[in-house]
Amino acid sequence: FLVSTGNGNYLVLFTYMSILNLGMFGLSIYKKWGELPVIAFVFTYVVMGIFLLTGFTTGSTHISVHLFIFATLFYFIFLLPILSILRIEAVKKNRGLLLVIITNNFIYLLLGILFLRNMGLPFKSEGLLSLLIAIINLVLVIWLRMSKKDYKFLIYAMLGLVLTFVSITIPIQLDGNYITLFWAAEMVLLLWLYVKSRIGVYERATQVLMGLTLVSYLMDIYNVLMTSSSSETIFLNSSFATSLFVGLATGAFALLMGRY
């Protein structure tokens, strides 16, 4: 059932998973089980990944529309762990939930770009999706601040997401190299979270992302050297947008390291 490519099966599968995820979230709130949203998050995107590898073709416009709707639904479902963080006092559980919230934003953008590109829209929408994600996180930041409770670290994390997705909107709209952009942005975001929390897992994740960003950027440069044409403009192209963003991200990273 999970790997079937029947036209209707994936609709049933992802509808069932949506209901199951909502039920697990409700149970996690009632029992204060912070692990349940993490398990549901991993399971959901593993199944989504299996379907994309086995049952998805890039020419399927109507399937892309359906999957974009489900990806959006999953995105909002996995923003709900914010409520769990507000109720669960255990620090270790909250770390896992916060990582789910952060990763959820980046996965949604990646999946959204994939599906939007196959929907045949008459305009470029990838950068608009990034801006929409930033706006959603900004609304959550405003809501948390209006609650007048001490959720400072959660607010910092959400505000970091707002700044991250606003900053990558233009490079994405110019068809920048998405993986490099995501890793560079997340590298700075996780360093900021480490500076604010001093949680070791963020430090180690930042170190890994530094290496991944460097390798990915060097691969991008190599591809540009091998495939560039004389007709491309110097500035208004994806390679320049990616290089500019990586440079700014590296500068922000160095500034954070120097100040803290």
Regions found by a protein language model. Give the residues of each.
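Extended, compositionally biased regions that are outside compact catalytic cores
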Residues: 1-158, 167-260
